[in-house]
């Protein structure tokens, strides 16, 4: 599926700068308003929907997070970040089996495809999102009462953690 870009290069840079600034200052409510406005202005930009999903999640608005993620999935179902954010939204709404299905879509992909494919952002990012998918799958398994599977995934997640590779989860959360 070819991505239809509706934002100009300058608009994308301004968007990314605003996004980074509001995130780094934890201005989630302001970011939510900004993203809703951008979504109205650019309805075919899946990245806006997936960022809105993430923002809703940070605000504890899990139903809205899932809805925004579903919209992003309809626009671009093959972007690993979109899939991951959708899995997080499903997990947050206690849809653990559905989240596992999405996480498996990420985990089955080759690391080089994630890193350097159409939506890739490099090897460190690919390693990060794939490893965090392992941990999130483990937590879903745990919630489904599948302790052995969860334990194996957590051990694998911890073994693959590396300096310089970001994780959404601290070691304290994992252990």
Where are each of the predicted segments found?
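Conserved structural position within tetratricopeptide repeats
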Residues: 39-40, 70-74, 105-108, 125, ...
């Amino acid at each position: 599926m070819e991505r239809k870009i509706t934002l100009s290069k300058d608009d994308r840079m301004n968007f990314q700068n605003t996004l980074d600034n509001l995130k780094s200052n934890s201005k989630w409510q302001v970011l939510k308003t900004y993203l809703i406005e951008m979504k109205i202005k650019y309805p075919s930009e899946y990245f806006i929907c997936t960022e809105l999903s993430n923002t809703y999640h940070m605000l504890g608005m899990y139903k809205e997070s899932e809805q925004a993620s579903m919209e992003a999935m309809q626009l671009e179902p093959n972007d690993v970040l979109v899939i991951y954010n959708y899995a997080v939204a499903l997990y947050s709404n206690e849809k653990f089996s559905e989240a596992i299905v999405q996480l498996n879509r990420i985990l089955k992909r080759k690391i080089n495809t994630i890193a350097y494919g159409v939506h890739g952002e490099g090897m460190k990012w690919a390693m990060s999102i794939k490893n965090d998918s392992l941990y999130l799958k483990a937590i879903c398994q745990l919630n489904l009462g599948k302790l052995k599977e969860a334990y194996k995934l957590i051990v694998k997640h911890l073994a693959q953690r590396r300096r310089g590779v970001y994780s959404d989860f601290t070691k304290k959360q994992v252990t």
